[in-house]
């Protein structure tokens, strides 16, 4: 019983330390200059047309972590690090199968697309671009062919390096 109490105490100290270390970063994010540069709906459209690729990219990174740090094989076997697997699988579940404001299950990426469509962003090209990125073997060449800004291409190529 004492071991459990010590473990819980150590976990609380560890989590509190993480929270304290994150606070300055959260403040920096809250005060980011980007918030001051978006002054109109057109500015927001420009931003979201680029940012949508980061939303999709995050899910790709998350799936990479899930593949490499959890068990997704058949036959199934226990994960070597169940705490990490639990965290990753919880994030995946939230990102892939959250509920929108109407209670409809959908991914955060799909919610983002719905959101930007609501203020006039056309998402057809975005979806065509993302759907064309379907092979890791050719992804760098496929990214290069996309009709998007070079900085977005660089961002995506960095992820898939």
Label each region the model flagged.
Residues 14-29, 113-116, 120-127:
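Non-cleavable N-terminal signal-anchor transmembrane helices
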Residues 16-29, 39-78, 94-99, 161:
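Alpha-helical bundle segments that constitute or directly flank the non-heme di-iron/ferroxidase center
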Residues 32, 51, 104-108:
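Histidine-centered active-site/metal-ligand motif
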Residues 80-86:
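Short, well-ordered alpha-helical segments
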